[in-house]
UniProtKB/Swiss-Prot annotation:
Belongs to the bacterial ribosomal protein bS6 family. Signal peptide: none annotated. This is Small ribosomal subunit protein bS6. Residues 117-128 have a biased composition (Basic and acidic residues). GO terms for cellular component: cytosolic small ribosomal subunit. Residues 105-128 are annotated as: Disordered. One of its GO terms (molecular function) is structural constituent of ribosome. SUPFAM superfamilies: Ribosomal protein S6.
Length: 128
């Protein structure tokens, strides 16, 4: 299984019951497709960079989960069909990179570079 993250934006004027229903349906899709939900965060209502479907604000949700390509296809299909969700995006995460301290830095000593001599610029003016 691969790790994915999805951010989706719902309409800002939804009630708490509708928001709980949307997040429950998203969790249900992940579990039914044999995925493993790692994190579900409600980032709250934020101003959108540009109006989407005549909304200037939206409520953001963040998901991180393990799954396969079929899970992503089904999740995005369900997000697309829900009229209350105005945008979504899923990305596949790469494996965790080793910490920067674990990678030795390659130090090389270079000879100091001498400054280039200043170029003289001659200006000529023609008098007529």
């Amino acid at each position: 299984m691969r790790m994915y993250e999805t951010i989706f934006i719902v309409q800002p004027d939804l009630g708490e019951e509708e928001l709980k229903g949307i997040s429950a349906r998203v969790q249900e899709v992940i579990v039914s497709m044999k995925g493993e939900l790692k994190r579900l965060e409600d980032w709250g209502a934020r101003k959108l960079a540009y109006p989407i479907e005549k909304f200037n604000r939206g409520r953001y949700y963040y998901l991180r989960f393990d799954g396969d390509a079929a899970l992503i296809a089904e999740l995005e299909r369900r997000l697309r069909l829900n009229d209350k969700i105005i945008r979504y995006q899923s990305v596949k995460l790469e494996k965790e990179a080793p910490a920067a301290a674990a990678i030795p830095a390659k130090v090389t000593e270079e000879e100091p570079v001498e400054a280039a001599p200043e170029a003289k610029v001659e200006t000529t003016t023609e008098e007529e």
